[in-house]
Amino acid sequence: MLDYWKYSVFRLGLIAALATGALTGFEAHAQEQIQIDAAAPTTPFPHFWEQMFGSGRAILSLRESYRDDLRAVKQVTDFRYVRFHAILHDEVGVYNEDEHGNPVYNFTYVDQIYDGLLKNGVRPVVEISFMPKKLAFNPDALHPFWYKQNVSPPKSMERWDDLMKAFAQHLVDRYGIDEVATWYFEVWNEPNIDFWGGIPRKDSYFDLYAHTARALKGVNPRIRVGGPATAAAAWIPAFLKYTAENHVPVDFVSSHGYDDEPVQRLLGTDEDIREEDRTCAAAAKVRHQIDASALPHLPLLWTEWNVPGRDNLRDTAYVGPALAEAVRTCDGVTDYLSFWTFSDVFEEGGPARKPFEGQFGLRATGGINKPSFYDFALLHELGTQRIANAVRDAIVTKLADGSLEIAVWNLPDEGKTPQAKQVTLAIQGVPKNTRVSIQQVDEEHSNTLKAYERLGSPAYPKPAQVEQMNRETALSSPEHRSLSNGSLALELGKNALVLIRVGP
């Protein structure tokens, strides 16, 4: 878990302000100066935003396109965990019944799925979902997603318990408890909305959670289990109260929130909170709820988030500054901030019709690197010690050799036309002519969407076209400059994310 309270008064004040919606109404300025003291104290800055990613459902991980995207993203991030739905979907074949109605288990595809992840250096967040039809109380309780997962409770809780025990025991037998104990087992997905058909919804989910957690822990107490994996930061106090009062095991809290969710739904307020602040405000709310509970030690896994989906923003350079905002404001709040998703190998609405449809991933259909792919690559270079700064559009970090890695960005005000702005870094504590290097993603740099449009926006790009787009948009070599009397002047284009290295 994060040592949450060790962070600076500045950061705690920021978190509190976000939780109450106080940080609103900021406007980008045409000119901005950022004061940096390289000798200032630092605080740990774990890379919580790039260590866990979501993806399309379990069976898709057997596709080579999925694995290609996983390997590509892992090359430019600290990708450690992947979370997907539907490991118990009938297409995975885990649960069946013989002619006498007796349970029959089959873990063949489960093994292929998890073997493939581990072979590529990524571990699973085992989201335990959805209900096998032959175990379902209502076999016809199908979700409208394209793959029609069953959202019913089990017809027999005893059979569910047995399935959970067999599932966990198989994983321990195959991979060893030392490995499985590093995984996270998350019970269901967003049970507060239409992914769960139990009645009453909350109480029936809590019962499912209790049975699942006890069954998993019955196989080995080192297995880590948590929830409630709710949409819109819901149910957390009730979940923690239930688990504490009923002595139900829980090793972590998980929930979801997206930047474009309604403020009332996400935060329970009518405050005017800009989209880019909403996810971390919700996470801060949940963190405070955990701290106020009987289980304040629990880590928080934010297992789904993304930038707004309107206007196909997820395919554009906008993701960079929005991502950087989330990294800055969620620092110290969540143990993981899991971007949904790393790949557009994703079929909730059916197979993709063409690349760049505004899907969630960092790579478009066919293995095309989106601008967001390069945004994550830039932020990966940040150090693991952070220097506090008073502006909202910069992150200052320090490396072991004393050099600085600084991210600055130009996030447009909501509803306003994005414009370029001038930024001056005034840096103390380094030689006044120190060498710097600069890389960026913006409308003109590493913008694969524009490269795709230059090719005529083909619905089915040929492999050579994909290779061409990725080659043309790869991060450019750093621009080398020097400080001028301790200062560096930059012009940030609209939707720019810029990484500056100061020092060796």
Which functions belong to the PLM regions below?
Residues 88, 130-132, 189-193, 229-233, ...:
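Active-site-proximal loop/turn and secondary-structure-junction residues that shape catalytic pockets
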Residues 2-14:
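Bacterial N-terminal signal peptides that target proteins for export
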Residues 18-27:
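C-terminal segment of classical bacterial N-terminal signal peptides
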Residues 183-190, 303:
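Short, conserved phosphate-binding/catalytic loop or strand-edge motifs used
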Residues 339-345:
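Acidic carboxylate-rich catalytic motifs and surrounding loops in phosphoryl-/glycosyl-chemistry enzymes
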Residues 26-184, 203-232, 248, 292-297, ...:
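Non-catalytic accessory regions flanking glycosidase/transglycosidase catalytic cores in CAZymes
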Residues 201-335:
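Noncatalytic carbohydrate-binding groove/subsite architecture in carbohydrate-active enzymes
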